[in-house]
Amino acid sequence: MINLLLCKLRRVSVFFIMKGVYPMNNLWIFGFEALWSPIFLSMMILVLVAYFLIIGKYRSYIPHAEKVSKKQQFYFVTGIVLLYLVKGGPIDLLGHIIFSAHMTEMAILYTVVPPLLLLGLPNWLLERVIQVRVVRLLLSTVGKPLVALLLFNALFSIYHLPVVFDAVKQSYIGHPIFLAILFVSALLMWWPVLNPLPDHQTLSEIKKIGYMFANGMLLTPACALIIFASTPLFATYTDPQSWMKAMELCVPADTLSSLQLTGPDFLGWIPVLEDQQTGGVIMKIIQEIVYGTVIGYVFFRWARREREKEKNEAPVLPPYLQTKP
């Protein structure tokens, strides 16, 4: 399977180099609002303003609130910027037109953004967030490691069943609700691994590594279904009527009606089946890179702590047995 993924990756690179710029140019016909979502941009700016006010100006009002490191600030800002780009920028619009863009959006939204946001929050702020009743209830129920693991991967897999995918993609209400639930489940899935609070640790370091391996295995069937399918699976990207209905979720109705488009093939992108397989490969590769990075991070942190523990527990020799310099 690794060889197949690498082969597909090479083909993706060639297609992107040859045709990748052309679709982005064509997206301008949908207008600035559809491409950059000013409302969502305003929301993300407000989140960043609130974050910097809390860790800066108002930090002195919070007991035991320490200064937030530049690294943590970088993590949080990067997470918010990526969240905007995949949900408010051109990637979101392109994800309604071609499946590979949709899977790029999914990969970043659920495997990259949540860990960055969690790593960007200081301990003293996290302690107050988890005291919120709703958050506390979620962590005590579906936030348990095994439940969170199964919940996220089940929701992700169910979402990409063709019958569910097409129904959700074309629903004004179902689409944002399902994606919001999936995002919360992603945060809960990452919590047992990246939670820095000593009083809320539920997994040892070695169990965290096993947890991430299990995550990768559980996500594989959904990606494999997409990668190895011999026919296009989703009507949203093949049936003009279904595609047009899905496009209504992100493009103003008057703009869409004035364009007189017949389907997603107006972009001149790669064949639908190739695009679908490419999407599965992109999701799997990004997931493997992120999960592998986190496993490495957890392992080396564990090894460093063990060395420090051994050093601190080493017996101190009496003066007459110590080697003189």
Regions found by a protein language model. Give the residues of each.
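Short, Lys/Arg-enriched N-terminal segments with co-localized hydrophobic residues
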Residues: 3-23
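Alpha-helical membrane segments of multi-pass proteins
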Residues: 19-325
